A protein has these predicted regions:
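Conserved, single-site charged/polar hotspot
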Residues: 8, 19-386
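Sec-dependent N-terminal signal peptides
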Residues: 3-16
Length: 386
């Protein structure tokens, strides 16, 4: 459902009201880029600019004003238009009004990025960009970055917002020693800037402060993937850690979706070479090759046993860059065909399965409980103090 501009603005205001009761976090942005020069432009609101904790302009920066920052000799050179302001170790842009938005643009990043609230840039061995932003605005940005285009259902966005919020709070101290909470790359969660999609904002608003906890009231590990291939995987088989809420189960909701099936052709000798290199010359024999040319997974198998060898299907997936480790093998002439199911590691929530469940009328809490065993959805304020 597409939202009207009026409703979109209402959701922005509603989220802002909720944000008064929310937490702020520090997210390192542009973390995968080594940016030497960047333009910081004010899009909306007013910003006070501090350089080494001192205010350098009498008036706040207003929309359309821009500052150029250049990393030089382990310091940050600051310019406003053709005017040289100075060289500093730390720069801060602090929003002073409602709806403060700025952009970052550089020839060294893929596209212009838009962010909300505050920004701090510190000179280390490179420029370190930290967006100080409200938790709920960050969550909406994560959902837009990770799943925009996969669905238009608000109920699905509620699921993703709850999953992302749970992950964020469970990993809040991951980068604390480096001066921030999370980075914007997939190492933490993909975060490419502010959310501009009304349906995602609504999903975040309607699931405000919801998190997923296990039977002991601890935040869970919210593993998810694109498609389970009809069966989710047990976390223990992938990560060698027993997790009572991440168990293997039949998932008919993922069947028939876009990423349900795949196929890959591999030259016969290349397939043989993998086994010879990893497990020895015995795989040059016709007897061994007969086994590696005829392998069936009716259910997910993490370990493929051939005589005395235990072969990880995950290793095969990684080596051949497969969509999943859930595949069967067929030999035709000089080519090995892998007939696979699913996309991703298969642990936890299947995004395409969840989308199907939403279409069938399941609530977002029912869907979460289907993919995560014996869990509850609560408000994070019940278990965490900021």
């Amino acid at each position: 459902m597409r939202l009207s501009k009026t409703l979109y603005l209402f959701l922005l205001i509603a989220l802002a009201v909720n944000n008064a009761f929310s937490a702020d976090i520090k997210v390192r942005v542009l973390s995968s880029y080594n940016v030497k020069t960047v333009d910081v432009k004010i899009i909306s609101g007013n910003y006070m600019m501090l350089c080494n904790n001192l205010k350098v302009f009498v008036n706040d920066l207003i929309p359309d004003e821009a500052i150029t920052l250049t990393f030089h000799n382990n310091q940050i050179r600051v310019e406003k238009g053709i005017e040289f302001i100075g060289t500093y170790n730390q720069i801060e842009f602090i929003g002073k009004k409602y709806n403060n938005v700025f952009s970052l643009s550089s020839t060294q990043i893929d596209r212009k990025r838009y962010y909300e609230e505050d920004l701090m840039i510190t000179a280390r061995h490179e420029m370190l960009f930290i967006n100080h932003v409200d938790l709920e605005k960050y969550i909406a940005g994560v959902v837009q970055s990770e799943v925009f285009g996969s669905s238009e259902d608000v109920e699905f966005f509620k699921i993703q917002a709850t999953v992302s919020r749970t992950y964020c709070l469970a990993n809040l101290n991951r980068h604390l020693k480096e001066g921030y909470n999370l980075c914007d790359d997939v190492h933490c969660q993909s975060y490419k800037g502010r959310c501009t999609n009304g349906d995602i904002l609504r999903g975040t608003f309607e699931s405000f402060s919801d998190v997923i906890v296990d039977s002991t009231n601890k935040l869970i590990s919210t593993a998810y993937h694109s498609n389970s291939g009809g069966m989710t995987e047990d976390a223990h088989k992938i990560w060698q850690v027993k997790v009572p809420y991440l168990l293997s189960k039949v998932d008919t909701f993922s069947i028939g979706a876009k990423n349900y099936q795949w196929e890959k052709a591999i030259p016969r000798q290349q397939w043989i070479n993998f086994f010879v290199i990893r497990y020895g010359d015995a795989y040059k024999s016709p007897e061994k090759q007969e086994q590696i040319f005829n392998f069936q997974q009716k259910e997910r198998i993490a370990k493929w046993v051939i005589d005395d060898d235990t072969i990880s299907t995950k290793d095969i997936r990684d080596y051949f860059k497969l969509r999943s480790s859930y595949f069967s093998v067929e030999m035709k002439k000089d080519t090995v065909y892998l007939h696979g199911k699913g996309y991703g590691h298969g642990v936890g929530l299947s995004q395409e399965g969840a989308i199907k469940m939403v279409q069938l009328g399941y609530s977002y809490i029912d869907i979460i409980r289907f993919y995560y065993n014996n869990v509850s959805v609560i408000k994070y304020t019940d278990i965490i103090e900021f």
